[in-house]
Regions:
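Active-site neighborhoods and metal-handling regions in enzymes and metal-associated proteins
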Residues: 1-192
Length: 192
């Protein structure tokens, strides 16, 4: 995307956008152009200076800039997004409340189920998804759940499989890194 004082152009494969999204972008003053057009647009960019996101610029973009003076910094958009309005705050609160209810129900189920025996990491994942699904606002996972027991909790981005799926016992630690997509927001929770 190239944003200037006068306009904003999103370079994208328009087949990826619905008509509704296209109309919305245009109503916000954002023009659409073919994804591959950004290279030429950067070469033809008339101003002498340009700011690029220091962590998001790839080599092709850097090579297309030419001899312009480039400022590498953090996106001012990210800074603006960090300031939340009341609607966003309420949405986060609703999403976290929904997630909290599911987590409390999971913990209430977990202790007696583990003491009874036969609960695996995959069972914990499935039970949490089941408990979230009771909420009509739940639309799916925000990322794959990590339910890691004992030594598995030390494995970065561990994901149990039917072949490698620890049986829980009433001792030790269970790491739960999970998140849900709700109509009002997205959650990311890590607990032991």
């Amino acid at each position: 995307m190239i944003v200037t004082d006068d306009n904003a152009v999103l370079y994208i494969d328009e087949r990826k956008l619905t008509d509704e999204v296209k109309e919305y972008l245009q109503s916000q003053g954002i023009s659409l152009a073919p994804y591959t057009g950004i290279w030429q647009a950067l070469k033809e960019y008339e101003k002498d200076t340009l700011m690029i996101h220091k962590n998001k610029c790839n080599a092709a973009v850097a090579l297309s800039i030419g001899k312009k003076v480039v400022y590498r910094g953090n996106s001012p958009i990210a800074l603006m997004k960090a300031v939340k309005n009341e609607v966003e705050i309420k949405g986060f609160e609703r999403a976290m409340l929904s997630e909290g209810v599911a987590m409390v129900k999971l913990l209430r189920w977990l202790k007696p189920a583990v003491e009874k025996g036969g609960v695996t990491e995959l069972d914990v994942d499935a039970k949490l998804t089941e408990l979230r699904s009771v909420d009509a606002a739940f639309k799916g996972l925000s990322f794959a759940t990590i339910a890691a027991y004992a030594a598995n909790a030390a494995i970065v981005h561990y994901e149990p499989t039917p072949a490698e799926n620890a049986l829980l016992a009433p001792k030790g630690f269970l790491l739960l890194d999970c998140g849900g997509q709700y109509l009002s927001g997205t959650t990311d929770v890590t607990r032991t």
